[in-house]
A protein has these predicted regions:
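Catalytic glycan-binding domains that act on GlcNAc-containing polysaccharides
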Residues: 24-181
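Bacterial N-terminal signal peptides that target proteins for export
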Residues: 1-6
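Bacterial N-terminal signal peptides
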Residues: 7-17
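Signal peptide cleavage region of secreted peptide precursors
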Residues: 18-22
Length: 181
């Protein structure tokens, strides 16, 4: 119901010139993103906030919000409290050096999402290729680092990274299928 009201509000804002077309496109993905996030967190204020943060970060950095959703789900299961054994933390599992290089506070929920989106965009630009190939390399770089991708000329032979790329591909394809319905 809330998203139906949101749609009417966006329509009014578009008619008055206060909303951009990209915001309307983001709305089309918002129900899918919210459904995926709420599937893990339940229908909650956090799920609604996180959906908006994903849409905002996707718009800001030019990253498909469905891809950001897939990365976040694989990285942290949508938990800001997630901490990896190697020290990555938050929704997007930012490492200390990565967060510092991006100029974000990885313990701040919004900055964590924005930092992850920015880093993913950087990897997408760095490993741009034809279609899925470039995206696969970018996702692998998000996990293993760009140096590993360059060293091996593609996805490195690390079992964790191979599994990670497969997991994100599976989630992302599922979200894209929902968007096509």
């Amino acid at each position: 119901m809330a998203y139906r009201i949101f749609a009417v509000c966006i329509g009014v804002l578009m008619m008055t010139g206060l909303a951009r077309p990209q915001q309307v496109l983001a709305y089309e993905d918002s129900e899918i993103v919210y459904s995926e996030v709420a599937g893990k967190l339940g229908q909650s204020d956090e799920a609604a906030w996180l959906t908006e943060a994903i849409l905002y970060a996707g718009d800001l950095y030019g990253v498909d919000p469905l891809l950001l959703t897939a990365v976040m789900e694989a990285e942290s299961g949508f938990s800001m409290n997630s901490l990896s054994p190697v020290g990555a933390c938050g929704y997007m599992q930012l490492m200390p050096d990565t967060a510092a290089s991006l100029g974000v506070d990885r313990y701040n929920p919004l900055e964590n999402v924005l930092g992850g989106a920015s880093y993913l965009r950087t990897q997408m630009e760095r490993f741009a290729g034809d279609g899925d190939y470039g995206l696969t390399e970018a996702v692998a770089a998000y996990n293993a680092g760009g140096g590993a991708i360059e060293k091996y000329g593609g996805v490195p032979p690390y079992s964790e990274t191979i599994s990670y790329v497969g997991r994100i591909g599976e989630i992302y394809r599922g979200l894209l299928a929902l968007a096509e319905d």
